């Protein structure tokens, strides 16, 4: 029986990259032995902080950190109701921190505890954007020169709209020049306006241009971000077939996944789905019925490494590959959790990557190394990453509500982001 037990659980809020992050630190009775996890739900940081401080911390103190599965299962049902994104982000941070502790206890990196390496480097895809086809092409060429072989191409932010909400995206995403939205009423409610139909028609033109200019030696991806109707998603997926996308992401909203059956019958474009799911069972019918090719789990929203490894194995048995969600609004600790799973999963597909600025790398020593389109984690015990708490305190969070989620169609109707 282990003599180790949890003595303290704390949350650390910091924004060194301009994006609000939530970090969990679990301390033990062994001096210097602690674990770190990512609990970032950028849009609701204080709700997650409260869930950890007021509920999970008292629940955890005194428990053996080695009992990861038991802690996960008991914490998940301790509130009776099945968890939503707030509680699941809190639980994810706890779970990652426990795996970090277990790796440090064993003197091994987490990927060794998950079965060991299946590959030597982690292939990455990065984001490009532009106001028109030429700007997207130029941006993609720049990424290709950096060595990236997988590139996500957007023309304007999701749906062709632009935004100045820098708290979520690290750089301004311009509005597409050649998408002409329908007129709006005389008065307009606040929000980011876009035209789903005009956007859906523009994307095949974008990829026609890119394939003519860049050829087929680079893998191209696109994220619809649920900003089109299901029938338009089917039209788009079919129209994109000649351009051989690596995958089309989130063509429908989580509420409309039954449309994927019709999409699958009409198109061979590979589909990635699920960054908004918060329960691993939401993927089960999509995997069972072969409706998707890649799982887009946001590991910080589904409960951490423990459920992510299970859904990865289930996907492997059904010919589905992983593509963990990794936008700018997860901490480098969450990035490391993704990558330890990437290294140990035989059905790894691709890893999304958002470049980190110097401030992030200073606050979180041990960030993955990126070279020529591949990522490499270090071989230190645990997740291999730490936090400089004194430096983190110099980057306070802003909190508040984001504006980019307030998407509206031309007549002012609120649309899913």
UniProtKB/Swiss-Prot annotation:
Protein name per the record: D-galactonate dehydratase family member RspA
Residues noted as binding Mg(2+) in the record, renumbered to the chain: 223, 249, 275
Named cofactor requirement(s): Mg(2+)
Active site, renumbered: 158, 225
Catalytic activity: D-gluconate = 2-dehydro-3-deoxy-D-gluconate + H2O
Enzyme Commission number, as recorded: 4.2.1.-, 4.2.1.39
Residues at the site labelled Important for activity and substrate specificity: 327
Zinc-finger keyword on record: no
Entry's family note: Belongs to the mandelate racemase/muconate lactonizing enzyme family. GalD subfamily.
Cofactor binding note: Binds 1 Mg(2+) ion per subunit.
Encoding gene per record: rspA
Keywords attached to this entry: Lyase, Magnesium, Metal-binding
GO MF annotation: an example: gluconate dehydratase activity
Stated role: Has low D-gluconate dehydratase activity (in vitro), suggesting that it has no significant role in D-gluconate degradation in vivo. Has no detectable activity with a panel of 70 other acid sugars (in vitro).
Broad EC category: lyase
One biological process term in Gene Ontology: amino acid catabolic process
Amino acids binding substrate: 43, 127, 275, 296, 325, 329, 352
InterPro entries linked to this entry: DgoD-like, Enolase-like_C_sf, Enolase-like_N, Enolase_C-like, Mandel_Rmase/mucon_lact_enz_CS, Mandelate_racemase_C, Mandelate_racemase_N_dom
């Amino acid at each position: 029986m282990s003599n180790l037990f949890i003595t303290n659980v704390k949350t650390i809020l910091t924004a060194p990259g301009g994006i609000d992050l939530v970090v969990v630190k679990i301390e033990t009775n062994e001096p210097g032995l602690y674990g770190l996890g990512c609990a970032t739900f950028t849009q609701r940081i204080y709700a997650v902080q409260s869930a950890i401080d007021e509920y999970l911390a008292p629940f955890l103190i005194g428990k053996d950190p080695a009992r990861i599965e038991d802690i996960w299962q008991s914490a998940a049902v301790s509130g009776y109701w099945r968890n939503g994104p707030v509680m699941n982000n809190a639980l994810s941070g706890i779970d990652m921190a426990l795996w970090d502790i277990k790796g440090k206890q064993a003197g091994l990196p987490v990927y060794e505890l998950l079965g060991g390496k299946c590959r030597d480097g982690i292939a990455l895809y990065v984001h490009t954007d532009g106001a028109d086809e030429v700007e997207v092409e130029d941006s993609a060429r720049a990424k290709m020169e950096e060595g990236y072989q997988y590139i996500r191409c957007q023309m304007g932010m999701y749906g062709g709209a632009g935004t100045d909400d820098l708290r979520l995206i690290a750089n301004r995403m311009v509005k597409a020049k050649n998408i002409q939205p329908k007129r709006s009423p005389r008065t307009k409610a606040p929000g980011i306006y876009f035209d789903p139909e005009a956007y859906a028609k523009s994307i095949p033109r974008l990829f026609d241009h890119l394939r003519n200019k860049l050829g087929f030696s680079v893998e191209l991806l696109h994220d619809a971000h649920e900003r089109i109707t299901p029938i338009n998603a089917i039209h788009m997926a079919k129209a994109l077939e000649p351009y051989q996308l690596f995958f089309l992401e989130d063509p429908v909203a989580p509420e409309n996944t039954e449309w994927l059956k019709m999409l699958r019958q009409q198109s061979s474009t590979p589909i990635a789905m699920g960054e908004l799911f918060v329960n691993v069972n939401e993927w089960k019918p999509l995997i069972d019925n072969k409706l998707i090719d890649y799982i887009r789990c946001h590991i910080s929203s589904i409960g951490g490494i423990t459920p992510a490894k299970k859904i990865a194995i289930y996907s492997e048995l059904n010919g589905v590959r992983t593509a963990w969600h990794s936008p700018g609004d997860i901490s480098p600790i969450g990035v490391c959790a993704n990558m330890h799973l990437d290294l140990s999963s035989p059905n790894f597909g691709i890893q999304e990557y958002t470049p980190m600025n110097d401030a992030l790398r200073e606050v979180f020593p041990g960030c993955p190394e990126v070279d020529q389109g591949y990522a490499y984690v270090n071989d230190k015990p645990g997740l291999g990453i730490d936090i400089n708490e004194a430096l983190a305190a110099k980057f306070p969070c802003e909190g508040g509500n984001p504006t980019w989620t307030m998407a509206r169609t031309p007549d002012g109707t609120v649309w899913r982001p």
